[in-house]
Amino acid sequence: TCGALEFKQTLTKYGCNKKYYLAEAQTLVYACRIVEDGIVNIIGIKDEVLFSALPASHTDHILNTIAPYYPCFTKAENILRTGLENIGAIFHPCVCLFNAATIERHDEFWFYRDMTEQVAKFIEKFDAERLAVGKAYGIDLLNVTDWIKFAYNDTKGDTLCERMKNNPAYHDIKAPGSIFTRQ
């Protein structure tokens, strides 16, 4: 989330004076999990992922250059939008938080497939905060339920819970073995 801004600050801090193009995607193109060092299991590929450059005036140039390789990228107006649209920052901590005891007991469960309506409703409440931040900045963000359909066009279901359970890219993703997985 807003990694391009952090990267630019680092380049500036260390005095980089070369010409460069800097951009970020809202999330990974792939739904994937690491198998071991150097090996990743790609479970699904998103249909659409927001993308923006810093400065935003470079977005079209970069998109035109990489479009043959990443046709899923969709232009966002700026990196604040790509940063605030990082739904993983809502999904991952919420699902882990509401399943912390299960994870700590090392009980195996499917991260999305075992979603419950109540946990999905809590996720939507957390997401309301993200939407309010976007609105304060004049950015109309997608809510989590609509985002799944945006990213994975063929996902079935009306509710967040149904879409999480029915998204083929999420079907075989197991929960982490520790609540400290992404420190």
Description of each model-found segment:
Residues 2, 16, 32, 72, ...:
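Generic recognition of cysteine residues
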